[in-house]
Each structure stands twice: as structure tokens, then as C-alpha cells.
């Protein structure tokens, strides 16, 4: 029984006189269901049709009919039994639940109506608000009653006829509002408030998610659909390749084509595929655009690579230096393999170059390439010039070119056949590009490829390799590696030779310097011979002494004026005449000094000094304007004292023993001598009280110190220099003490003294000494009493530091006091002018 027969039979049964309007409603619903049966081919279609026929409230809840469904009428069953039972239509394979239950559910509400009042189709005006909603508010969770259930005698039927109600909707917005909404119709407001995501999904969840991620790669989906439909090139070619791998499958494509609902209800992935499926031959259009894009890109890459390989192969075949290199390798290998079966070789394979390159000698840093570079240093430069494109060609894969060419040829032929089968003017442009342009470029590229293949065979024959196993890529990589190692070895060789030359030059330079030093080294001359030889020559003062000469002369002039004053005072004594002033250096005359000239100073003589030479010349100039002393003989020791005593003839004779009355002045200054060695002073004087001179002898008395040694002038020093300590005290009376031979301490030579001024230390006053807290100079561990525990500053103790086991030593030994003796003591007598030291003070 067909669907039309079933509809006609149902119409006859339902449109009877007893059924009334309820039967008409049943017939209407049944006709809709029968019409939809043609569109149901899968479970998804059945579920979709079921959702359309179900009655739902605003919250998507199914409205169940209150009265139970009545049993079917018996006349319908009897008629169906009398009719011959037709074969039942085959159910859909994927349909699990048949649609009759919802059909019966839809019948029950119409049968449960007791009154024949017509069902209101629209909501009564009394129930609708008088103001459009502009604010998003909270929703009311209730169960909505359908208009078909409402009866006239019910409360909702009576309220539908009631008058309008005045409600303050602004107050509702204030209390229940969330956010404002765009002004739209009442139907849209109800639709938005019922459900947020009311999308129909024709794909699985995972499939829909992957498609949504892929669509984000396109800037504009609508523009993409237009470009595909009009055969325009797509800018996002990479995204188009991803899209080609995710196109709808056959089942998905069939479901998309059967969809007749609203497109706006579909999800974005389903909507995109739905629009794409509507384009005729959409898959072929996308595939053609991808092929054309890949074809142009591969041609731009492969064509230059093939040309480089052709050029490099020709350079290897025509290079004259490469056979020379192989000849050197063969000779070296046959020499090294002369005692085994590997010798006397006619050649070697290209793979053997890997082992020849890494062949090391008895030293790890020396290889076979080092020897080759040493023998033929220009070989590397010639090879680099002849094989200029070898480095670029070694990075190209010949197998990839072969595979790409085969792929392009197969793809072009396949698309050409597909486009020819598709009728229509829309594919004319694609067909011309594939059939004419692409074929021409492939033919030209194939000719170059065939030429490269022929060169590969020539190289195999050139190096005596097998054509079937010879690979152009491997050959180019071997020669490129050989070139790199040769360049590296050449750099090492040049660096080694440069270092060797620098080392030899440095050695020659050192040898030359040593020879020059030996030639310039003067002979060692005796100092006495040098001084004797330089007596008659002119003086050669140094530049350093010339600067000091002016200051020394100024200082010398001041000191000389003082000496002249002294000589004038000494000359005032009438009896006897004063002794003549002697020269500062020696008692000899100036003529004798002029005759003897000092030796010139030089760095070769260790005992010579520039300052000594300068002082000698300075004293010679001073002695030139002084009165010359008559030559005198050296006085004998016993006669020295009587001659010196003639100086004080006019002075009263000094008694041998002098009574020293107590002096109000301070004690005499006694110089301290170092302990353990007492040396006799060069000048011995005594301080004595002399009565005031008379009027007759009212002359100025100049103190003259008499010694057995020749007199010397004062040393010349710079202003501010510290004068040496002297023990000579000037007194109104000269006391001459006859002293036996006393060893005179020689004065420090001028050559050992510093010419720089002595820096004076600031003197410490007594008040400053009191303020400074001094540490005890004695060990406080041995003497606890010395520890200062008071707040008063401690005075520096004169006691020396002592250890616990050390024996006490005398703190000070008194200086020997000189006792005047009579001048009649002979030189052979024992010196008795020294008083024994007093007892030492013990700790």
C-alpha cells in the first residue's frame, strides 16, 4: 500500500460525521507525517523530524498530554483487516525508534477536548505586555500551557477575554534587569530568551571542532566561497591545502544536501560545508587551484637546480686539475701499498676517497693531504677556480628532482582528464592552463632533465663506475668534502710555515743583538791607570752636576764670607800671627791641588762618583783666591802642643787645676756615645769659667778648635738642611788640653752623603706629649704594675722591653769625663784624662 492509498483511507475514516473537527485535526497531522516520510533516510533525519513534531515549552521541555491516549476505533481496524495486507515498507537501517509514539501523542490532546471550541492560534492580547523589552532580565522558570489545552470555561480561557492590566514595566527592569538589549521584534525577544545556542549540528562534535579551527586560517569565509565558485585564485594557498584534506566525506555530503531547514540555525562548520556543497564540482575546483599553485612554485625551484647540476657535471668532466690530483693519489697509494696485494693499482673508486682523505701519518696532526699540499700548494687554488659551482650543486638532491617531475606529470594528466569530462564554460580557463601552459613548461623542464641524466651516465663512465649504481649526489658530495679538507689543510700549512719563519727571524734577531753586545762591551781597565791617564786631559762635567753647580756656588759664597770674617778677627791679634787658613780639602797649596786633577767620572768605574768630582773642582776654584800658605813641614807629635799654645800668650795662664764653682746655668751637654765601644772624640774641649776681661784686653776672642788633624771647611748644604751634631762649645776662653795620640774618627766621606735635603720631623712639644696616650714599652705580662688602669694618660716609660727570663742590664753608662792634664805629658805616657764611668743604674 502506497502512502497516497494510506492517506486516502485515513481521510475517509477521519472525515466522518461523528468525528467532527477533531478528526480533521488528526487528518492534518497524519498528512504532514506521511509527507515527511520521504525525507527520512537515516536516524538523524528521524530525530530531526521528531523534534519538529513534538510540543515543547519555552524551556525545551516536552509537553505531555494530561489524558491518556484512547484505543484506536474498531472500524479502522476492521477495514484494514478486510483489505489485502500490503508488504510493509522496509524501515530505515539506522532508525531505532519508530515515529508512531509521537504521532499518537499528538492525537491525544485533540481527542481529550470535550468542547468543540476552536484552538486559539495566537496569544491573547490581554496576556501580552504593552511595552517592548529593551533590557536583559532574569527569566521565570515555569511550565507553559499550550493554547490547544486551554478551554473556554477554564481560568485561562476566561482571562483571555478580560481587560488589559496596567503594569509598571520600568520597575521590573530596575529590579530584574541585567543588561540592555538591541531593539528587536517581540518574536526575536522570545526566541533569544528561550535558548542561547539554538544551532543545528550536522557533523560530529570532534569533526566540527577541527573544521572550526581550520576555518580560522581564512580571513573571510564569504570571499573564499565566492573565489571557489568563480574559479578565482585563493590567496591563502596553504590554508586551502588544509581545507582540501578536510572536505566532507560522502555520508556527510549526502546529509548536507538533504538538509532543507534554515541555514542560520546551522553551526559555523556545518553552515560552511553546506554552502560549499552547493557549488558544483567544488572538489575539482579546489584541487585544480592547489595544483596550479604547486606547479608554479616547483618550477621556480627545480629549473635553476637542474641548470646548476648540468654546469657542475660539465666542469668535472672538463677540469684539467682534477686528474692531476687523482694521479698524485694513485702514486702515493701505490707507494704505500708496494709490499702487498693492494699495490700496482690502475685506479680507485670514488668511495675510496673517503679513506684517503682521513689517512693519518705517524703523527696525528699530519695526514696525506698535508703532504699533498706541501708538494703541490697551487693545486687547491686551481681546483677552486675550475669547480666554482661544486658547493651549491652538492646541496641539491637529484632524486628529489626526479620524484617532483614524475608527480607533476601525473597530476597534470589526471586533472586534464577530469576537466575534459566536466561540461560547462566555467572550466574552460582551467582546462587551457592545464592542457597548454603546464604541458609546455613540463616538456621544457623534461628536456633539461634528460640532458642531466645523460651527463650522469658520462660521469659514471669517466670514473669507471657502474651506470646502474652510480649516484650523482654521492659523487658531488665526495668532491665537495675533498675540496673543503684541502682548503683547511692549506690554511694549516700556511700557518705552520709562517710560524716557522717568525721563529727563525726571532732567532736571527737575538743572535745579532748578542753579537752587538759583545762588540760594544768595553775592556775592563784598572781604576788607577784610568786616573793616571786622565790627569792631563780636560774636565768633562756631566749635565746633572751642571744644574747643582749654581746652587752649590751660592751656598759656598755664603760660607766663604763667614770664614773671611773669622780670619779678619783672628788677624787682629798682634802676638803671635794667626795660623793661615788651610784649604778645605788638604793642607797643601793650591798649586799642588791644581797639578793633581781628578779622574773623570764614568759608569764603567764603580768607585767614582759625580758628586765627588764636582766637589773637588769646586774646592779648587775656592782655593784660587785665598791667600797662599807658605810651605811647612809636618810637625812632630811632641812639638804640636807647644806651638799651638802660643796662640794665647796675652791671656792669663790657666791653672792646672780649676775649681768649678756651682753654676746657675744648666749642666754641660755631654755627648752620648754608643755602648760597648767608646771612641775618642776628634776634638776634645772643656768648659771653664773665665773672669771677665780687663779693659786693656777688651778684644773679641774667637774660639779656635785645635786638633792634630788638618782643618776642613764646613760642609756645603742646601738651605734648610739639618746641620750635623757637634760637641764643640764656644766659650770666652780657649782651653788647650795636651792630649796624647788619640785615634781620630774619620769623617764620613762626601761621596756617601745624600745631596738631597734632609726632611725634618716636626718637634713634639711637652703639651702634645702629655695629650698622646703612649703604650708601655715594657712587656706588661712580666710587669703587671705597668698596666695603666687610671684615666690619666700614661707617660712613655724609658724602660726597655724585657722577657721573663732575661737578666736586667744597665740602662745607661755615663759618658767618660775628660780631665785636663798638664801639657808636659809625653806621648808615650798612658792616657789618664778619662775618668772611670760611674756605677750604672740597675732596674
Curated annotation (Swiss-Prot):
Gene3D superfamilies: Formin, FH2 domain. One of its GO terms (cellular component) is actin filament. The keyword Cytoplasm applies. It holds the Pfam family FH2. Residues 54-135, 568-601, 748-767, 773-843 are annotated as: Disordered. InterPro entries: FH2_Formin (IPR015425), FH2_Formin_sf (IPR042201). GO terms for molecular function: actin binding. It is found in: Cytoplasm, Cytoskeleton. Keywords: Actin-binding, Cytoplasm, Cytoskeleton, Microtubule. Residues 66-76, 83-103 have a biased composition (Pro residues). Disruption phenotype: Defective cytoskeleton organization characterized by disrupted F-actin and microtubule dynamics leading to abnormal excretory cell tubulogenesis. Specifically, F-actin structure and organization in excretory cell canals throughout life is disrupted and microtubule organizing centers accumulate at the tips of excretory cell canals, with a strong reduction along the canals, and the direction of microtubule growth is altered. Residues 127-512 form the FH2 domain. Residues 776-792, 819-830 have a biased composition (Polar residues). Expressed in the excretory cell and mostly accumulates at the tip of the excretory cell canals. GO terms for biological process: actin filament polymerization; epithelial cell development; epithelial tube morphogenesis; positive regulation of actin filament binding; regulation of microtubule polymerization; regulation of tube size. Its main location: cytoplasm. Belongs to the formin homology family. Constitutively active protein required for microtubule and F-actin growth, structural maintenance and organization during excretory cell tubulogenesis. This is Excretory canal abnormal protein 6. It comes from Caenorhabditis elegans. The gene is exc-6.
